[in-house]
């Protein structure tokens, strides 16, 4: 009897597996009629998934592109994904045919925290998206509001420096700078959302924790997009459960603050409420801004510090550039001085080139039947833009894997090509709406941290690990610990 039950169970498993295989083959047959760009050889059922392990995905795809071309097709199981990696193909997708590629390929699991794809970065282009983006970029992220934020952000930098000094004093001179910078970014985002006068450290600390926790589950979305039947896997079900748990945390955290706020018209909440959006959409849009903005400038500034710990000459050049502008004045580097610091701007650009915060951008999807460099691309095709590969293209950049800020001080041959090959915020219709405030936050933080402290390794002879970890953004796989010494004790 037990043997019969076992055989029946095995037979059922085989039947299910066979059914999945048949469905896969039928769907694959329809895809095979399309002439996709070339790519690595595939295996049945899994496509190219076996080739995407090891390094982080953007690095793996860059290596594959060197073999199979700057426009290649990667099969995530039965799903074709076109990956573009050079200047011409990236520019066509992002700029020349921006509207053709402006749809989004959002994972189902992401809809849990995005009000069913009603946030800026998850919604397709169209009237709703245009209204939402215009409200963000003309209001809280507009030039007037950013200018109004500058004195507040400068005072916040004084707080960051003071808290770093206290942290170092309590820990033998060693700190984790990312923690301090993230808290500063969270405070900035909160002011953009709720208005300049918003000041609520318990709320900001709680939001920081929620974002940190949710970042750990970024890979679940990729799993779902790779396998249509991933929803039946235990790991995916656990991920969905975690997303729902965090959705409730977000609601419980944001809802009372929204209810008690009287936001100014130039705040994000003020705009969202003026459109009479549902509470679910308002909370989703607010959380998205934290998710995308909280870590980006903080992580990029931390990468820059790590590069300068590894190359003390770069750090000294930057310090001298700062002193050239502000002289012997002790105190804060002001935002108005940043544009005069040419080497600072070079370090900022080189850091964003080496470690783009979103190395694969956010996956695009064709909104219509279109073409790419002469090859037909059907509507609904997922297209990934590998900004990491673009920023490390040896045909454009000299010694692309070496940190050399000087490359941005003296133009290389082919000026226009170099400019088109440097796209840390993307380009075209879907360019990052927070580009200007992000650059300001990064530059202001870096200038002040190098002006206030000399940065060295936490342990003598142990340089920072520069390995990437791709979550929703690129972070340091090993969080930076550094020893700081005040320059003006």
Curated annotation (Swiss-Prot):
GO terms for biological process: phenylpropanoid biosynthetic process. The chain crosses the membrane at residues 6-26. It comes from the Eukaryota. The keyword Plastid does not apply. It is an enzyme of class 1 (oxidoreductase). Pathway: Aromatic compound metabolism; phenylpropanoid biosynthesis. It is found in: Membrane. It catalyses: (-)-matairesinol + reduced [NADPH--hemoprotein reductase] + O2 = (-)-pluviatolide + oxidized [NADPH--hemoprotein reductase] + 2 H2O + H(+). Its main location: membrane. Pfam families: p450. InterPro entries: Cyt_P450, Cyt_P450_E_grp-I, Cyt_P450_sf. It is a single-pass membrane protein. One of its GO terms (molecular function) is iron ion binding. Heme binds at residue 432. Its cofactor is heme. GO terms for cellular component: membrane. Cytochrome P450 involved in the biosynthesis of etoposide, a chemotherapeutic compound of the topoisomerase inhibitor family. Catalyzes the conversion of matairesinol to pluviatolide. Belongs to the cytochrome P450 family. This is Pluviatolide synthase. The lineage of its organism: Eukaryota, Viridiplantae, Streptophyta, Embryophyta, Tracheophyta. The gene is CYP719A24.
